[in-house]
C-alpha cells in the first residue's frame, strides 16, 4: 500500500434543529396552550485512533465529512431527534491541526483514543419554553445554532523509540535490516529509501524497541531539497536519535562536513528536534582496518567537538551492532516516556441546556415585561380570563 503521511479534510458538524411553534388543539379543550417542542442537537465529528491503519491514503480521495443535522421540534412537546455523529478513523500517531488557526487540536497516540474535532449546533427552543403568566400564547421560538466547520490537516508521525539520521547511503537501511525483521530496499545509489519504515528490535523475550528509518538528508533540506525534510516530523516522538556517519564515503566527501550538514538541517527544522539526545555512530568500519577506523573516528569526533561516547559499527557484517543495541535498550529503560495528560472530552448528552438558551429566555421575558401594559387590551380574552380568576 502506498504510504501517505499528510492529508487535508473538511469536517462539518450538524446544525441544531429549530424549535416549533404549536398550540394544543383537541376536542373540548379550546385553549390548550403552547405545546411546541425543542429541536435536537446537531451531530458531532470525532477522530478515533485505529492501530489497524498505517496510512492516510483514504483521505486523499474522501475529503469531506458531515454529521447529521438535528431534527426540528414538533407539536405535543416532541423534542427533535439528535443528529448522528460521524467518526473518522486514523492511524495511531496522527496529529490533528486546525488549518484556520494553526492550532494543534490533539495527538492520537493510543488505540481507541477519541478526539472531538467539530461540535454539533445547539437545539432551538419551542414556544412552550416561553410561556409565562403574562404571555399565555407565546409565538416565539429560537432556531438551532450552526455546527462547527473546520479544515483539518492530518499529519501521520510514526511512533518509534529510536530515529535514524544520516546522509543518503550512510547505511541506515542496512542497519535496520540487520537489527530487525524490516526489509527496506538497499542499493548503492542515493535516496534508495523513499518512505519511512519501522523495525522492531527484540533484545530478548521481554525487551524490545522500535527504530524508524527515514530518507537521507542533504544540504538545503530545510528549504525543501531532497526528501528527508518532509519526513523529519516522524522523529519528533523518538527518545534518541542515532546519527550514522559513513566513515569512508565512496564519493570522496568529507565525513565531518556531512555530519555538520545533518546538525544544521536539524536546527533549521526544529530546535526541539535538535535538542533531542543524539548518538554518533560511525558505520562501514569493515572497509578499513581496525586501527585506521579508530583513528579516523577519533579525528572526526574531535573536529565536530564531540565529547560524548561514540560507536564504531559495520551494519553489513554486524560488527559492534549488538553492543550498540543493548546500550540503546538500557537508555530507553532508564528514560521512560512521560505521558502527556489527555484533554478531557466533553461528555455526550442527549439534551443540552446551556447559557445560550437561558439568555434567549431572559431576553424574551424582558421584552414581555416591558411591553405588557402596552399590549393589554380590554378585548383580549386572555386578559379577561386572567382578571376573572383573580
From Swiss-Prot:
HAMAP family: GTPase_Obg. An essential GTPase which binds GTP, GDP and possibly (p)ppGpp with moderate affinity, with high nucleotide exchange rates and a fairly low GTP hydrolysis rate. Plays a role in control of the cell cycle, stress response, ribosome biogenesis and in those bacteria that undergo differentiation, in morphogenesis control. Residues 129-145 have a biased composition (Polar residues). Its cofactor is Mg(2+). It is found in: Cytoplasm. It holds the Pfam family GTP1_OBG. It comes from the Bacteria. This is GTPase Obg. Residues 127-147 are annotated as: Disordered. GTP binds at residues 166-173, 191-195, 213-216, 283-286, 314-316. It comes from Escherichia coli O1:K1 / APEC. InterPro entries: G_OBG (IPR031167), GTP-bd (IPR006073), GTP-bd_Obg/CgtA (IPR014100), GTP1-OBG_CS (IPR006074), GTP1_OBG_dom (IPR006169), GTP1_OBG_dom_sf (IPR036726), OBG_GTPase (IPR045086), P-loop_NTPase (IPR027417). Mg(2+) binds at residues 173, 193. Its EC number is 3.6.5.-. Keywords: Cytoplasm, GTP-binding, Hydrolase, Magnesium, Metal-binding, Nucleotide-binding. Residues 1-159 form the Obg domain. Belongs to the TRAFAC class OBG-HflX-like GTPase superfamily. OBG GTPase family.
